[in-house]
């Protein structure tokens, strides 16, 4: 991984802020973000060589429930992770994972933005036991290897009896539980699939004395 630069984004929209999930198209230009207040943001990154210098064609709107109904309750709006499942961010399908009212939805995305979900993944009963602040924090679709096309979702800090992180993988629609070893008390905050079938997991830890650490 190489640091290319950063941007400070501002908007007068009341829906702007609290961005908790981000996905880029394969060319690294089109992006989609989702927020913990139930909004989506799309746009195109502008580069100077390899360094991002701005955003254009930005659009913002609310995530919706089935049949394009509004998400009225706060606990229904807390989107924490997003990934591209099919196509592109201009014409494709995305998966959005929510905390609070734990669920993972399939949404269509086009040049007009994000429509309401077509369906939700069937979750294992155990996932309903996650507390509101320890639910899904990462979702991705594996791009290669034996489980190419499988959906993987990881919880922030829902742990088993041995203290390991809990997640699930959907292979041909069938759920399987998996665990990640907890090393150093870090929480899971995002994940991204690699072309070879691997997965990069981003973790963070906060302490009043040490501040925020990420790896």
Where are these regions (language model features)?
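Sequence/structural signature of beta-propeller domains
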Residues: 1-215
């Amino acid at each position: 991984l190489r640091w290319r630069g950063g941007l400070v984004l501002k908007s007068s929209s009341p829906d702007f802020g609290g961005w908790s999930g981000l996905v880029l198209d394969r060319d690294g230009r089109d992006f989609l973000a989702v927020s913990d207040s139930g909004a989506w943001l799309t746009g195109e990154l502008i580069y100077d060589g390899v360094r991002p210098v701005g955003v254009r064609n930005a659009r913002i709107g609310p995530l919706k429930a089935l049949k394009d109904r509004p998400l009225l309750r706060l606990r229904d709006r807390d989107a924490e992770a997003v990934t591209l499942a099919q196509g592109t961010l201009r014409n494709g399908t995305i998966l959005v994972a929510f905390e609070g009212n734990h669920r993972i939805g399939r949404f269509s995305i086009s040049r007009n933005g994000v429509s309401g979900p077509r369906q939700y993944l069937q979750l294992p009963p155990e996932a309903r036991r996650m507390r509101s602040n320890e639910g899904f924090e990462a979702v991705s679709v594996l791009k290669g290897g034996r489980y190419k096309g499988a959906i993987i979702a990881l919880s922030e800090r829902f742990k088993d009896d041995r203290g390991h992180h809990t997640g699930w993988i959907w292979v041909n629609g069938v759920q399987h539980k998996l665990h990640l070893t907890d090393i150093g008390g870090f929480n899971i905050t995002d994940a991204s699939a690699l072309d070879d079938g691997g997965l990069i997991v981003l973790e963070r830890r906060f302490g009043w004395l040490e501040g925020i650490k990420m790896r």
